[in-house]
Amino acid sequence: MRNEYPRPDFIREKWMPLNGTWNFQDGTDKTPVKIQVPFPPQSRLSGFQKELTSDRITYQRNFFIPAEWIGQRILLHFGAVDYKCSVFINDHCVGFHEGGQSSFTFDITDFLSGGEETLTVAVTDYLHDETVPRGKQFWKSSGEFIWYTQSSGIWQSVWLEPVNEAHLEWIHFTPDIDQGTVEITYSLSDCTVFPCELEWDIRFKDHPVSHGSLTVSEKRGKIIVDIFKNKALRGSFHFTGWYWSPEHPNLFTVSALLKSRNILLDQVETYFGMRKVHVHGGRVYLNNQPYYQKLLLDQGYWKDGLVTAPSEENYIQDIQKAKEMGFNGCRKHEKAEDPLFLYWADKLGFLVWESTASFWSFSPQSAAVFSQEWTRTIQRDYNHPCIILWNMMNESWGVPRLYDNTQQQHFARSLYHLAHGLDPSRLVIANDGWEMTENDICAFHSYKHGSLDNPDTQAAFSLGLQSLSGLENLVERPLFADRFVYEGQPVMLTEAGGISLKTGKDKKSWGYSDTDSEESFLAAYSHVIRSIYASDLLCGFCYTQLSDIQQEQNGLLDEDHQFKTDPKKIKAINDSRETTTSFSTIEDY
């Protein structure tokens, strides 16, 4: 059962998990069966593990509100439900949500009976509709190629939480390492009676950093807190021990208290990292230093849970294994990952390019829903220092005419500006892979690395990585959309490899190229990575991929997320690039 605290970046002491056994109905089935939430009904861990017969499914369970919660407002939280749902308490509709990747909350207080309560979630997931965001979920009955089994309904945690009428809705932290400050923005509930006091206590490794309070007279506001205490020379060489990075994932813990006349109304435990990311001269900088990204494509699938990890420990192990192989981050692919993963990426030190599920057929309605999902995702995940980039779209999915269609180009550009408007502290890629409009990184995909028995193709791959003109020969479509050109952005190969190590167990499995032994796999892997390292044009890469997924058997881990080869050998290849390499300036190209 998934009963870990589901929102570790915004913790309240009192809460109640609603994960576990629920009643479940597929379509018009009259007799409910048992299902384990939050695992999708198509997964083994759900206990149902069947292909759905209908777009409509229903969940139901009973619960009691603890006696000590009486008199408070009761919030019902959903981590994510795919695709849209209506929520009922005791047959009264308390709210509706559309969007399979985003979290949502309803205040259910006024619908409670005071006894045994009945919670019903009526879900609609359009199994074959290509206009709704679906990511890698195939619209046919079974997975093929790079498409996987569908994951419908509740797929992240459900829980209850008591709060006073006056409480904190959210807190955002925006660090500024150049000034040594953090900007704290906040929002209070609509029922808050003003004036009241907002108090904060910031600590670093249990050492006090800042303690203060502010009289609040409006629902929303901001505070600037001096973290480095106005000390001289706040630059890179004096406060790096306080910065967040994959090598040193330093976090500041925060207690935020809302009070009225010295009466505690709300208390939240949270955290932030002092971290800066920007681009300059064709390079990506982390904390004002050039930083070479060695990323893994991570699609967040598990054999038994599909898009839902079997446990919190699975997130920890994935990050630890990736770091053990010499990677410093991941590009999340077609999925807004569970906040628990982001928490452990913060704690363990692991860069994240955040994503969400794409739709496939363009329409203004699809574009509106997709934009709304991104708005919610950025709002929810804003505080995670591990996230350095919002990766809005992939390979023109959902915008198939992006190259020359003005409307679709406007949409791609609108996503870029939406993300920067909501969050100026991170990088943004509107479209990853090719047909770029406005991107902070020139991010291209190529699997034309060749095979060990085709040295000419291997040589062409290595040569193509040396120049912008050479990249055009390595991608499936033009690098830039019509009327858009390269403007000096950092250049990264953000999908490459996908090499399969075939063991003969499953002839239907595939990769972008095949090997038949650990020795041949390591030779092929080394060719890809060393070709990347030989290019002064590139400032990072993303290798496909972390783990095998169903028929796509091209991961560095198998479908059980265990090593397929010696991780020390992978790390030796990844570490073969000299960290002291001096970058050429982009003007050289």
Region locations from a protein language model:
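Substrate-binding/catalytic cleft of secreted carbohydrate-active enzymes
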Residues: 329-561, 569-574, 582-588
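Secreted/periplasmic carbohydrate-active enzymes, especially glycoside hydrolases
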Residues: 1-332, 344, 373, 386-389, ...
